[in-house]
């Protein structure tokens, strides 16, 4: 009995040691075993021995091969097309395919045995098995070859454990088999090859200076394309003599630029590219090859490392301008105001021409917050792609059109692995509404993050591993082999232009100096910096290679270096007296717009729309095609809206919004609304996209208003705030004539994108002179829903307000909402708008407007009067101004709480004044209004806790206004919730008690 128990264990040990047998091969093992049971001589002797050892317990091994019972058999589905695509473990299929081919060749006399006679059946079987083993070995190189590639220029990286996965012996080949030609059916570009011939191609392709990861890609066409592009006897990295000299020239420029600045500005921060100079010829190759394949524009985003080099050597920014900035000079013309930013954050744009193809390059300005520029670049690229097609386009732009604009992102290794926004952007890459036909990611992998070693900055072997989740091909390459780097850049560009998918280049290099030039890296990385000090520069190494090839002499190289240094000296002299004279931020799509230089000017814009036009739009908003099956609740919604249009009364929030969108679209302004659940609206209020209840077809009334209108896009975004808001901000930078809106699901969640608000939206214009008309809709209001569904943290945005940088509003009527949205497009400048939007007011009986309030001479009102003044037949009648005892100023939904409480109590000597726009603060308008009530007590009422909401922001402004009008009461009294750590209570009883308390305080 004991013997029988041991037999399957032994067999399982044999099975476990056979590395190419795993769960995916269960079918193959079963098929072989079935053959063996019928006729033991029909299988290879090794398999015969293996199966013989199983005794009667084959089921045990079969189970072992199949894996656990809960896995789904035959999943994932194998891609069994051509042989190249069938190499994913379905070996039975491969063997059958090869056997059939060999039989065909034998029949034609093309395949002969060792004696020169036609192949026997046994020889065909043996040859087929040789083929399968060879293909298994080839597949192993494709899967794991990158782990054995020569990637680290310093040679410090630990070699991975070698499990002999790539050894021919592992696949049953002994040295005695090395001279035998094996049929591999044009895999590796050869029909027949010996084992050494295969190894030569495989090692050169997968274990040289480039390591390619692509076997995680599920699309057989993409995988086959990469194999076809890099495998084969004629697929070596090869450049013409002119190409090699061009690479050398660019390397000399890159290295010489850094060395020149190091001499002239010793110790000044420049975040040099020293050690990663191969980036510069690689970027040139991307632009050049892209241009040949139809690329028109590149939008770049990058961190500080090497930025000045990219600006000057790739973007063509004048060196004298950079030297002027190093001297401390401004990058803006004298007549332009702005707070400025450090030189390694600034953007630029230029046109480059290669082989007659002109490509426009723009480098996006960015903060030091790593990787946050990524979504901004993607959004900018998307807008530029849309502009290529036009504002009246259909909603689906072909990816082949989008591919004409390339987002190109440069990353640091530690940041790419560490920052969550990277994964968010990868998540956006394939989504409708956010696709950009593939971003090219270039990681400058200097194997350190400030002072942090890779072992402490990521849990995966490579910084690029996060990109595997979207099946992006990854090209790891040794930065000290410039030809390999340029080749990788070329293939990566071709892949992106062919498949319109993201692609990653991971260039292993090093950082010759510290994190910045005033830093001492040996404190924390002594061994690495010992190796770096002894290591030749990339220019030295490549120069020696070209000298050995007889292409150049040392004198040629010295002359090239001297000429470049002389050019830089000339630019340095010119930089002493350089004056910037071109303000490029109002070029191109921004032509015709201006900066808003006078905070006191009238900024209403012509936002009213004739009633006739509004009714025409309203009619189209409620029409659906005859054969379209609308949900019955939606039909009721449409019927109610139709009544509003007929009567011109009772216009609610969502209808006013749709009329604003529709009127702008008819006037030629595209609308782009993005965020979680925006098609329907978080509170089921919007319904701008209708779904057929029978077949789920979509119908968008706002895109069916009239011929030639601009497009309306509502994009239900992924569940991210940071990347999506960054993306929409980027979009608004490229198309100032599109109304771009981002809506938070609840305003509480907007702080997931706080970096974008802080570094871009609130400060981008002052730092980089880049305007944005982005609208942020943040649902806000205290209704007893708890601390996570009550507050958009209005105070945060108000704290960011200064220097006329953005607008913050908390409006209370659909009409004012209509006008403030249209105002974004109806002025000749752009400012971001942060809107606290309502929840309960969406269906509040008092929060309604009339069509008359959207038309005629109407416009946005920063202050709104007390409704009781002109709703004469409703509720209480207010006393005359002189008899008003108290003025309660407020903003947002709390107005309606105050109004209803006052009505309930019959109070007629308290006036409610709404501040609809909190910033820019309407000081002059308030002076005019409050002058009527000089003797009244002044109260500021808010529903937010005292340390939140508008109180801290508005108090000094109101004090200034009261002093100005010589009011009896010089201080404003606070009425609202007491200061709190958490924004709101989650208990309805407590919420109502707090509400009653502060209403009593405000009105009593």
UniProtKB/Swiss-Prot annotation:
GO biological process: glycolytic process; tricarboxylic acid cycle
Classification via SUPFAM superfamilies: Thiamin diphosphate-binding fold (THDP-binding)
Enzyme Commission number(s): 1.2.4.2
Domain of life: Bacteria
Single GO molecular function: thiamine pyrophosphate binding
GO cellular component: cytosol; oxoglutarate dehydrogenase complex
Coiled-coil ranges per UniProt: none
Catalyzed reactions per annotation: N(6)-[(R)-lipoyl]-L-lysyl-[protein] + 2-oxoglutarate + H(+) = N(6)-[(R)-S(8)-succinyldihydrolipoyl]-L-lysyl-[protein] + CO2
A Pfam cross-reference name: Transket_pyr
UniProt keywords, alphabetically: Glycolysis, Oxidoreductase, Thiamine pyrophosphate
Listed cofactors: thiamine diphosphate
InterPro entries in UniProt: 2-oxogl_dehyd_N, 2oxoglutarate_DH_E1, 2oxoglutarate_DH_E1_bac, DH_E1, KGD_C_sf, ODO-1/KGD_C, THDP-binding, Transketolase-like_Pyr-bd
Family affiliation: Belongs to the alpha-ketoglutarate dehydrogenase family.
UniProt-listed NCBIfam families: 2oxo_dh_E1, PRK09404.1, PRK12270.1
Assembly and oligomerization: Homodimer. Part of the 2-oxoglutarate dehydrogenase (OGDH) complex composed of E1 (2-oxoglutarate dehydrogenase), E2 (dihydrolipoamide succinyltransferase) and E3 (dihydrolipoamide dehydrogenase); the complex contains multiple copies of the three enzymatic components (E1, E2 and E3).
Role this protein plays: E1 component of the 2-oxoglutarate dehydrogenase (OGDH) complex which catalyzes the decarboxylation of 2-oxoglutarate, the first step in the conversion of 2-oxoglutarate to succinyl-CoA and CO(2).
Protein name: 2-oxoglutarate dehydrogenase E1 component
Species assigned in the record: Brucella abortus (strain 2308)
